[in-house]
Amino acid sequence: MTKDYLIYGAELSPYSVKVRSYFRYKEIPHQWIIRNQQTQKEFNKLAKIQVIPLVLTPEREVLQDSTPIIQSLEEKFPQNSIIPSEIHTAFISRFFEEYADEWVVKPMFHYRWRYKADQTSASKRFGELFVPGWAKRLPI
């Protein structure tokens, strides 16, 4: 059994990058596994729902959804906590985290798909995850 946590995610997922950033900040041993065509079967066996990020703990526990993942790990790794110790500050921190998760991503998704050049770029990047080489065959 590996001592590393496994993070199934993708660079295009802000929630995956959020979780990976947390692991890096806390210096928690982990492996970054890109969810793609090669890892999909393994992901399907683990996933409760078909979303990333998914974290597999060394104890084989599956965690999904960025905020609950981080909350769970804060209990196991309390050093250098990201949660302020003062209750009012902790509330404000949690408020901004929730706001960012639910609303700050809206403009990101808008600009990912609004303009033709961005649509083309994002489409190619998403397509390469599950059908490698597909963009080379299309006149995009």
Question: Each predicted region: which residue ranges?
Answer:
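GST-like domain detector, emphasizing the conserved glutathione-binding G-site
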Residues: M1-R137
